[in-house]
Amino acid sequence: MQTLPKERRYETLSYLPPLTDVQIEKQVQYILSQGYIPAVEFNEVSEPTELYWTLWKLPLFGAKTSREVLAEVQSCRSQYPGHYIRVVGFDNIKQCQILSFIVHKPSRY
């Protein structure tokens, strides 16, 4: 059984090895298939007390494929390599965030 080095945990998916781009695409495909609006956010720290993350551009209202969202994730990664980056699924009917997961952690962690 493979165990990961002891590190800080942020969410359910953080107990798994880092997600590959293919795995991120599958998660984003789920967001799109449920009719949620994907968005990309970033922040310098990932503390439970940090309620507000900076939005990368606008939410991707017109995104039809997971490739479009993944391209934005990769752009954000290249612009902010020392920040945490997460993908968010927003339900515009309930007006709330339904899910989010971290897709990039700074190299210091």
From Swiss-Prot:
Coiled coil: none annotated. Induction: Part of the rbcL-rbcS operon, transcribed in light and constitutively during growth on fructose. Its main location: other. The lineage of its organism: Bacteria, Bacillati, Cyanobacteriota, Cyanophyceae, Nostocales. Heterohexadecamer of 8 large and 8 small subunits. Forms complexes of many stoichiometries with Raf1 and RbcL. Belongs to the RuBisCO small chain family. GO terms for biological process: photorespiration; reductive pentose-phosphate cycle. GO terms for molecular function: ribulose-bisphosphate carboxylase activity. The keyword DNA repair does not apply. Transmembrane segments: none annotated. The keyword Lipoprotein does not apply. RuBisCO folding and assembly commences when the nascent large subunit folds with the help of chaperonin GroEL-GroES. Both RbcX and Raf1 help folded RbcL release from the chaperonin and dimerize; dimeric Raf1 binds to RbcL(2) leading to an RbcL8-Raf1(8) complex. RbcS displaces Raf1, resulting in holoenzyme formation. GO terms for cellular component: carboxysome. Keywords: Bacterial microcompartment, Calvin cycle, Carbon dioxide fixation, Carboxysome, Photorespiration, Photosynthesis. It comes from Nostoc sp. (strain PCC 7120 / SAG 25.82 / UTEX 2576). This is Ribulose bisphosphate carboxylase small subunit. It is found in: Carboxysome.
